[in-house]
Amino acid sequence: LNFGVRGAKNIRVIFSHAGKSVLELGGDEYIDIPTQTWREMLDSYKGRELAVNVAAWTKEHPDGIQYKSFTIHIAEEAIDGYVAYRLIPPGYIGWNKMAIMQRDLSSFEETPIITNNENEGGCINCHNFCQGSPNRYMLHARNKGGGTIIVKDGKMEKKDIAIHSHNATYPNWHPDGRFIAFSVNDVHQSFYSHCVSKIEVFDNFSDLIIYDTQTDQVIEDERFADTLQMETFPAFSPDGKYLYFCSSPTHILPFDVDSMAYSILRVPFDIKTGKLGTPVDTVYNAHIQGGSASHPRISPDGKYLLFAWAESGTFPIQHPESELMLIDLKTNKLYKPDNINAQGADSYHSWSSNGKWVVFASRRIEGRTTNLFFAYFINGQFCKPFMLPQANPEQNVQRFFSYNVPEFIKGKVDVDRDAMSAMLQSKK
């Protein structure tokens, strides 16, 4: 967890436990902790706290300044080995470079799963992994020859998953790996000159479908494919018995976009047939509880549901007021976890496989680019989050790209990018 002091000519740091020094290091503008040294220290002090004392010598403080010490708690539970995310320049419409990347969380190694060079400059998005598996995942590629890439146990296929001339959009794998739930969204955006938020992203319509990867069939349910309601952001329960999703009554858009309030619903799922059952339960009622919900994700133990809350709409990353909210699924009690939220949009998130960690996208640093933050979760509470570590901490500021759609992975994705490129450029 390297860190720095801007403008420093020299930095000294002392890690200590119970008043005894554990590790002492020095550096120029930042502290570069040797990887092996860091790992050994974490292993030695699992479940305990370390005090961190930092001193710096700067132009303003040529004789040095001692900063107030702080503590870090070393979690006993490990985090998943990798995190995947889309790396894209901040903006609204145009781009010339984007990629879905994977980062080794035990080092600073970052490698591409796919870049839009493989897709002739087209959009690549909506990656999703089955139970965090690096061998079973999917992503969309939008361009000539594009489609949905599905990888199962090393076998790669390109599928055209669409209904009513609209492509499948936001995905979530069923935990047994056979089915994928999608919302089919007709996404648009409007720009404003008189508002704090200069852009609003909305759906003209959105429905739910279930895709069967074994039979290559799309399963529709007329209850979730009408013009009265708009459904989006499906998410299976960890046991696979329920499908959660967001739903809002249809409005005249973009004129009524401020009235769009998405609730969270839950419906039984038949694991054998892929069909949705009854009853349809309301987990979060936006019209009673206020605001609008997006990105529901259930903890691996099935006890909690974490979602992104905004005052309205379905694209919280463009809402500065958006924050993460937690529902206890046993009591249905709604919590605002203050430790994890901060000023600036907090949005897409993912649970680790053991349910002890959450990664989420946030614009809390400067309001324009999106960074990744990690938070430890224990006894229904989040601990203070920290940003994705970099070898040089300045990279998070100097790298003018947004990280979005973070998803934990249990291991490294080994992908034949040449084969994927050939598949995406083929019309078949």
What are these regions (language model features)?
Residues 1-428:
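Sequence signature of WD/YWTD-type beta-propeller architectures
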